[in-house]
Structure formats: C-alpha cells, structure tokens
Amino acid sequence: MANVEKPNDCSGFPVVDLNSCFSNGFNNEKQEIEMETDDSPILLMSSSASRENSNTFSVIQRTPDGKIITTNNNMNSKINKQLDKLPENLRLNGRTPSGKLRSFVCEVCTRAFARQEHLKRHYRSHTNEKPYPCGLCNRCFTRRDLLIRHAQKIHSGNLGETISHTKKVSRTITKARKNSASSVKFQTPTYGTPDNGNFLNRTTANTRRKASPEANVKRKYLKKLTRRASFSAQSASSYALPDQSSLEQHPKDRVKFSTPELVPLDLKNPELDSSFDLNMNLDLNLNLDSNFNIALNRSDSSGSTMNLDYKLPESANNYTYSSGSPTRAYVGANTNSKNASFNDADLLSSSYWIKAYNDHLFSVSESDETSPMNSELNDTKLIVPDFKSTIHHLKDSRSSSWTVAIDNNSNNNKVSDNQPDFVDFQELLDNDTLGNDLLETTAVLKEFELLHDDSVSATATSNEIDLSHLNLSNSPISPHKLIYKNKEGTNDDMLISFGLDHPSNREDDLDKLCNMTRDVQAIFSQYLKGEESKRSLEDFLSTSNRKEKPDSGNYTFYGLDCLTLSKISRALPASTVNNNQPSHSIESKLFNEPMRNMCIKVLRYYEKFSHDSSESVMDSNPNLLSKELLMPAVSELNEYLDLFKNNFLPHFPIIHPSLLDLDLDSLQRYTNEDGYDDAENAQLFDRLSQGTDKEYDYEHYQILSISKIVCLPLFMATFGSLHKFGYKSQTIELYEMSRRILHSFLETKRRCRSTTVNDSYQNIWLMQSLILSFMFALVADYLEKIDSSLMKRQLSALCSTIRSNCLPTISANSEKSINNNNEPLTFGSPLQYIIFESKIRCTLMAYDFCQFLKCFFHIKFDLSIKEKDVETIYIPDNESKWASESIICNGHVVQKQNFYDFRNFYYSFTYGHLHSIPEFLGSSMIYYEYDLRKGTKSHVFLDRIDTKRLERSLDTSSYGNDNMAATNKNIAILIDDTIILKNNLMSMRFIKQIDRSFTEKVRKGQIAKIYDSFLNSVRLNFLKNYSVEVLCEFLVALNFSIRNISSLYVEEESDCSQRMNSPELPRIHLNNQALSVFNLQGYYYCFILIIKFLLDFEATPNFKLLRIFIELRSLANSILLPTLSRLYPQEFSGFPDVVFTQQFINKDNGMLVPGLSANEHHNGASAAVKTKLAKKINVEGLAMFINEILVNSFNDTSFLNMEDPIRNEFSFDNGDRAVTDLPRSAHFLSDTGLEGINFSGLNDSHQTVSTLNLLRYGENHSSKHKNGGKGQGFAEKYQLSLKYVTIAKLFFTNVKENYIHCHMLDKMASDFHTLENHLKGNS
C-alpha cells in the first residue's frame, strides 16, 4: 500500500487527500485501501458502494489497543454494520460530530446516543414499533414528523377523521429486512430475581445513564432509517407543517413533541406550596456535616422553555349539548360560562406538556388477551353522542330483534277487565300439601291463581329444554313496553318488544347456576368446622372429665362426621354487640310474618327432598342438614335491610331503593316483571285441571312461585347482617338459608324440564340474587387463600346468565338504531323503566366483578363479561333520575335519560371534550380504559400527571339544589368510589409492571415471597439501582396511593368549624363512605407501595424525595397513629413516641416528665404534642411536588441520581434550645423530641425556599446542631416503615370490627402481621 501523509484536523483523525489516491468510477464495488502510518493503520472504505461515481469514503482508525474509531457516525451505515466491533466513537462516552458526549446506551446493541429521545427512537429498530399511524391509509411511521410529511405529500395535508391510536401490525416483511434489524428479537430486560418473571433487573453503576426500553410490540419497520432533524418544540411551528386550513379540525394537543423542555415552575401554586418554604431538616432534627456530599444536579434546560398556547378549536370549545344531555346542568344556556368550555387549559398555565408527559409512557403490556384496541376500527364510524337522538329505525340485528305490535285494542292484546287479584300467601301457606283429589287441586289453583306465574305451561311434554326463567322469545307482551309516538301525530302508539332471533340453549346456564349453589355450600361447611373445632377446644379446657353434653346444648366436639342426621335444636349464640353502633328506628317494611313463613316453607321443602333417599335433586351434604337453621324475627330482618340500604346500595346501586318498601303484591309484580298474559294463564289452569301434565307435582309449582318472591329479600338481609356488629354466626346461617332457597328454585326448575315452560321474563331478581351471592362468597370465604376455581365457576354462571338474558335486551345497536332524528326511549310505567335500568346496572356490575378479579387477584376465565360485551349496551341514567322513580308509583310514562351506547360515550372524551358521566358508569369506564389501553400511550383518565378530567366530569355542583339529601349523599359516595378506583388502578399498573405474579401471590397468601422479592430493599431498591423511568413510575403510583390512604380517617364535621378557636384536639373517625369491597382490596396495595417507599428511603435516603417522607410522617403522626393507638394501645408499646403522645392525649396534663415542673411540662410537651397533631398532610401540595420531580427527571435523567457511597447515618439535632414562636406558619416543624422535652431547631430564623437550599444550609450549619452522639439512620430514628405496617394491620382490623364482618379483612390483617414480624426480625 502507498504511504500517505496524514495531517491531523481538530478532531484528531488523520486527513487523507482521497482525490490523489483514488480515481473516479467506483461502480457497485466496495473499495478498500489500507495505509501504513506511524501510529496505526487506516482503512478507507466507500460508504456508498451501491451508488455510481461516489467519492465518499469513511476513515477508520485502529488504535494500538485494537479499538476502532471511524469518521462515519451513521448508526445504520453499511460500513459500520460490516465491522466486527462497534466503533468506539459510537459507544458509551464517545463523541458526536458536534462534540457531545454519548451517554445513553442501548441495552440490546450497546450503541450510545447523546440524547434520550434518539435512544428511544433507536429502540424502535429492535421492536419494529411504529406508533404513528395515518388515519386515512393506515400506514404507520416511527416518528410523528414523518407522519405529517406523509400526510402533506400523499393526502394533501389531511390527517383523516382521527389519528387512530391503533398500530397496524405488519403482515409481510421484506427479505432484506428479515436478514437485518427486523431479525433482532428484543425482549424487555428483566430486573430482580430471575425466577419471578419481573421486568426489573439489577443494573450496573451507570444505570441512571440508560433509558428503559419501551414495550415489545410488533410493528412494521421502515425500509430505511436516516438521520433527520428533531421535531422539537422550538421548531414545531415551521418543521414539515402542512397547511393549517386542512388541520382546523385537529387540536394542537395531537402533535407530540420529541423532548419538550418541561417547566417545573408551571406546577407551582403559591396557595398550596407556601407552607413548604421552611427548613425541612428542622422538621426531622437532621444535621448534615460538611463531609456529606449530596448530588444536587438540577435540570439543564439551556434556557430553552416551551411556551405554547394549549387551545382547542373553536368548535370544540363551544361543544355543548342539547336539553336531552345530562351535561346541560353543567353547560346550560350560557356558553360563555367557565364550565361551558371544557379544555385542559383551565387546569394549569401550561397544559400541553402535561399531556406530552402523560403520553411519554413507560409500560409493559400485561394482557394475554387480544384487546379491542388492536382491532381495526375503520369499519365503524365513531359517533359522538347527539343528545337529541332516539330510536327511529326498528331493524333486526344479529343478536336481537325488534318486533312491533300495533295496539289497536283488539281482543288478543287486551287484558281482561276481570283480571284476578294476586294470591293471598297466608292462606296458601296454611296448606302445606295439596290434596290428591283433582277437583280440590283445581279449586286451590283457581282460588290463588298461583301468583300468575307462567312457570308451568300447559303444552304437551317435550324433550326440548325450555327454561322458564331464561326464555326471551315467546312473550305475547314484552316485559318492556317502549312507547313509540307516531310521527304523523295520530294517537296510535306502538309497543316495542324485544326478542331473540336465535335463542341459545339455556340448559347449560341452569346447570351452571345449580352447580354454583352447591359450590358455595363450602362456606357454610367451613364455618361449621371452625365453630366445631372452637367448641371442642373450649370443652376440653373447661372440664377434665370428657363427658358428652345433653341434647339441649350445642354441638358435640367429636366433629361433623359424628353428627347424626337428626335436627339438633339450639339457641342462637350470644351476640357481642358493639355498644358504639348507632341505634336507629327501622325504616324497611319489606319483611312481614307471611313472607317469613314463606321462607320457612321453602327451607322445609329443601330439607324434605334432601333427606329423601329417593329424591337426590338437592344433592346436599347430609352432614350440614343436622344443624337447624333458625329464621330471625321480622324486626331483625328489616333491620338488616336498613343496614343493606345504608351500607351496600350507596356503593353498588343495582337494586332500586324503593324495593325495600314494597308490600307483598308489589314485590310479586316486580319478580314477574309486570308482564303476564291472563289468557295464557287461563289456558294453563285448564290444562292443569284436566290432568294433561300428570307427572307434574303441584308442590313444585308452589316452591317455584314462593322462592322467587323471598330469595332476593333474604339475600339483601344476609348482606346487611354483615354490618351488624356481633352477629357473625347468624350472618353465615342467613347466607346458608338464602342459598338453600335459591338452590330450591333452580333445582325445582330443572326438575320440571319435561314440562314446557313459558316464562317470558328475564328474572332480574335472579341476577341480583346471584350478584349478592357472589359478593358474599368473596368476602366471607373462610379459606386461607382465595379459591380461584370457585370464583371462576360462580362468576361464569353469573356472566352466562347475564349474557343470555340481559345483553340482547339492553343493546343500543348504535350503528343501525340511533341517528340524529330519533326520539328518546320511553317506558309505559316506572316499574318497566326500573327493570330495564336494573339490567344495565347488573351487566356493568358483572363486568366490574370480572375486571376486579382480573386486576386484583389475577383470576381470568373465558366466560367473563368483556369489553366487546358492554360496548353496545345503553349507559345508565344519572342517580338523581334513578332515585326519582319508584316501583310503587304507576300510571305515568317514563323517558330514559341517556340513550347512547357505552363505546361511543367513552370515545366522546378522547377529543378533550368533557361532559357529565353517570355516577354508576364511572367505575366501569375506568376499568374499560385500564384494560383497553393497557400498554399504550394514550389515556383519557388514567394519566400519570393527573389532569383531573375524571373529577371534572363527575362534578356534583349541579345537584346542590335538589333538596334530596340522601340522593346527594349517595351520589358523592359513587363519585368518591370512582376516584378511589382510579387511584388504585394507577398503583396496580406499576405493581403489575414490576411483577405480573404479584397479585397471584397475594391471592395465595404468599406475603413472605412478596417481602423477599419486592419489599426487601437489599434485593430491590427503586431509589438506588434502577433507571429513572422505573423510579418515576414508582413515584406516580406512590402519589395516587397516598391520596387514597390519606382519606381513610376524617375529622368529624362538627369539629372542623368549632375547633378553629378551641384548644381541644380533633375527633377523628373511620370514613365509612370510602369503604367498599372493591376499595378495601385497593387499599391493601396502596399500603404496600407506601411501605416499599419508606423501606427504600430508610435504606438509601434520597434528599430530593425528603418531602414525601415528611408528608407521610405528618399523616401518621396527626391522624393514623393517634386514632389507632387509642383503639389498640398494646400494639404500639414498642413505639415510645406513640405511647407518649397517646398518654398525653388521654391524661392531658396528668403525665409529668421526671425532673420538670408541671408548668415546664405543660409549656413544653403540651405545645409540642398539639403542634405535632396539628400538622396535616398537604395532599395537593405533595402531588404538585411529585409532578415537579417527574418533570425535572423527564428533562434530566440524572436529576434523582445519588453519589456513591450512599450514607445512611446522620446526626439528628437534640440540643437544648427552647421552643419559641416562628414568624411564619410552620408546616414542617421538628419531631416531638421524645428524647427530651426541649425541641431544638424550631426557632431558627433562617428559612429556605427549597430542598436545595435546605441541604446546603444543613451542611454549612451542621456544627451548630451536632450533638456529638452516634449517628442514626432514618429507620432507627423514626421507625416509620414499621409504623405503617402496624397501621395497615390495625386499619383492616378496625374496619372488620366497626364496619363489616368480612373474612377477607382477616387475611389482609394477617398479611401485614406477618410482614411486621419480618421487619422486627430484621431490625
């Protein structure tokens, strides 16, 4: 090779005169020349070998240690790809052509980048992700600027109706791409132990300089990736922007910027944040010596900020609704009011970057099912609800049909004027058996009319199975009479009835329900075994002579296997009623003596056929029949109904409250759904009297008629008894009685299969009873771990019944049945409206159940109610509308308030429009979004930086003048439940990203494994060893968890106003309105996340997160610890500061400290304790603080870094300075100083305005505050993590003792007790 002299340029690379060494004409062949130099060989390579007449070469230098440096900085160049090793200038700490340091490393191929956005864009070459689809042609792009260029060139700047969030999966990949980047299979890196399936992993010391990859989603891959200028905020207005005229319908928030410089000052709110401008180290008595160095890196924004006006188009800002809309109370006629324009600009001064940050989502798809979001949506046009729409076209659909019958007063459709009265049940109950004489039987039937029940048809026997309670298609008059006004103005109305074109086979549904009622016998059996073991132990300890007790006593202690089948009569157990339970007058009147006797009659029927060896239909465990179940008195049953109405219905209003005030006739009309044909009944009576169906037993017919009346009321009383303190055993017995009655109905129905039954109603009472049965089984399961197979079987039976009965009748069929010229749905009576609305609510409730089990317990099953099932149903009406109607009222037409389907209603929020959400629908919409948009970047309500969209859509201001106190209270409870659920799901999203088997471990009671793999800071520490994105996701989940936990205990409302000028301490009580079955399980995970943060912070303190620690300490000291230590003082004996505070509260000034006078004690300890109790957590201020942390970390990935080695021992100030008044309100004051009475650090006049100044001040003045003692860690000084474990354990114990007898709470309290032992063992 020829030697060429290489003058050096400023970059350090030798310069070669290529024109003197090579001639022109490199045609399609790669040219190489190696030149010998004094220091290292140089390789010249053509970088464009496929192009003609190319004189462009790359210079590659080999260093003495064998490393390669090249002048070609193109990551995808063929030259760099053909090298054996990646050039050093493209690796970590290499330099870009502009001289910037490459500090962001790809964990797949080790290539490094100077900007994080470049790394994230590079990851798409491994994942083939193209997150920017064209709304017209579905072509996908890796960057948004490419999408805009495409739209400008191909579609004349038109982005289509919508920028779809779906990402089309490539079906074909070119052969060349298969052999290159597309063949790289990228897997999300796993963190933590290799056997738990986590997505976190141990990282090296430079982890903070790496960005976590996005989810592994298969996308189409561009054929060629080239370097383009970043579409940043500074160039957004001029870079590849199409004509604005073609984009008028698209708001600016749909353009996502690559790396916006987020401004933390936009989050500042002086009113919320003013109390945090004090020295936070004084609150913790913390001294920082001068040798303690802390990383104080602030984000370097280079003076570049983003100044955008976040505005929606005028048409969007003026988006109002007609009078039929539920939002008219919010918008009204004044479109210039504040609420008339729903956009995010009203929330904060700069809202665009909040959306940009929320869209910058780091997530891992957790669904193993095909999400509806992954399906093509182009065939279905998105319909924004027009609130004037009603049913206009009555067309057939695949799943249901509309049949129209003109009411022309014909004899066929006219109900007989001499319609028989309802049955007198008291007389029916006096006849235990019907005579065998045919004439006597006929007389009884005609006298009582058998409840007008169509359970037994007079048609000939058939081998086909026609289940009466599930048949939808044979109704002569529809159960829902929708009045459709004739447009010509005539008086003739049309009765619209629902029917099935293709009725499904109902036999399987009935079998599942019967099997379900058998399964839940295990609850009663497990309870009896526990009671028997308990009584056996008591008997053994009470006497040394093991003598058998007389028959008048309770059970023998030999076990259930030794119980005879004879009835053992015993008295009810003595109740340990809590005297704190408020007494109230009984309001419900549903139960009376005739109904109680009806319950007893069905129970006797159950026992009779269970004991009869020839009758095996009940299939009951004979050992369980040895215990006689005593029906409570009428007054007790009505009291349980009151508890059900006050504690269950406000959270789950699936049953109309007026049902609890019905008489027996009205209840019968409700169970029959107000629809029967008198002529058909007459035909039935004739066939029965003629003996056509000789094999049919009339006693069975009685049981069918009676059991459907009493089943739902008894289930309601059972659930209400859960809230009766001290009645645990009676609750289990009530549930067993309810189960037997339900089982009697189902088995008797199945027994009558040989008789063709013509029951045209969907039996809403049955679905409501099944829901209550399932909920009770969930909360009262006595097994140590939840039986997932039992839950699946029960919920599968419920979902199958609802899918067969409810879904066809409540489907809106939005594509064919709704248009802008329609009128609202109208019902002939309030009862018909309530039944129709109840079916919608039961369906949504079943959907919520399925999502709850899937999210919180990792229980999935094929027959669950899925998103596609609820998308087409009508949404429920507002609670004010629901409560205003009554089952008792009759004779007036009722119009449905909301008549648009679930899917279109949800998607109407995706464009920034906010309008009223029906309160009961809120939870279902949150579950729908959580499951639908899992693993995607687009969210409506579940944003990492909370934009309060959900809260604003659930605003209750319109209900202020209703003069309906009870209704308004229930509305507030439903809204709170929706917000609590949103916070819980935001926490669950992070937990499932960390460990997908986490919820399964909780379900199986494996708290020890959770501690080892998740809570143990030695093995997993988010503040030390993990990427900034993982830490930010953790802080997001922590923020929402703190919101929930801070609302568990509240001050009494009367105290809030009276205590302003009163020295008395506040009175705090359990917030019962925030408690429900769904919420309690979410609180469990919220406590787990808070404890995890405290453990990590105590192990490796990060002082930029010090404020979170202080706020959690304020929450514990001011509310949680004083309340729980008063109830359970022995549990806090290991915390001297808690004992000190509680003794002071109890004895006021009676406790003196040795060596001090009473005056000194009062002036010192009293003031300090009251100051400590007065420090409340500032939830909104803490949320602003965490959001600022997220913004700074987004701009600077090293913002939260800590220097090594991390120090965990500090000198806490315990000096002798006296307490004096501060010139400003001290929200972050010092600890109560339980090491002594003088509380140091409180009177220092130096006050800082940020954590940064706090730390500097602590270092400069550490010599003043040092006590010369041994250093302490945060865990040793405050024991805050251990305190919160104890708080969690006692909270669930307190809820069980004072709110609901739920065995699920025992499991939760037991988990935290186990965790408490782990922490104490490691301390």
UniProtKB/Swiss-Prot annotation:
Biased composition annotated in UniProt, kind: Polar residues: 179-206
This protein's record includes keyword NADP: no
GO terms under biological process: cellular response to ethanol; chromatin organization; peroxisome organization; positive regulation of ethanol catabolic process; positive regulation of fatty acid beta-oxidation; positive regulation of peroxisome organization; positive regulation of transcription by RNA polymerase II; regulation of transcription by RNA polymerase II
Residue(s) carrying Phosphothreonine: 188, 193, 259, 327
Effect of residue 134 to Y: Suppresses activity
CC per GO annotation: chromatin; cytoplasm; cytosol; nucleus
One Pfam family it belongs to: zf-C2H2
GO molecular function, one term: zinc ion binding
Outcome of substituting residue 118 to Y: Suppresses activity
Keywords: Activator, DNA-binding, Metal-binding, Nucleus, Phosphoprotein, Repeat, Transcription, Transcription regulation, Zinc, Zinc-finger
Keyword match Zinc: yes
Residue spans, zinc finger C2H2-type: 104-126, 132-155
Annotated positions of the Phosphoserine modification: 54, 230, 258, 299, 323, 325
PTM description: Phosphorylation at Ser-230 by cAMP-dependent protein kinase A does not affect DNA binding but appears to prevent transcription of ADH2 during glucose repression.
Subcellular location: Nucleus
Annotated InterPro entries: VerF-like, Znf_C2H2_sf, Znf_C2H2_type
Region (Disordered): 175-216
Effect seen on changing residue 106 to Y: Suppresses activity
Function: Required for transcriptional activation of glucose-repressible alcohol dehydrogenase (ADH2).
Protein name according to UniProt: Regulatory protein ADR1
Organism (species): Saccharomyces cerevisiae (strain ATCC 204508 / S288c) (Baker's yeast)
Encoding gene (name): ADR1
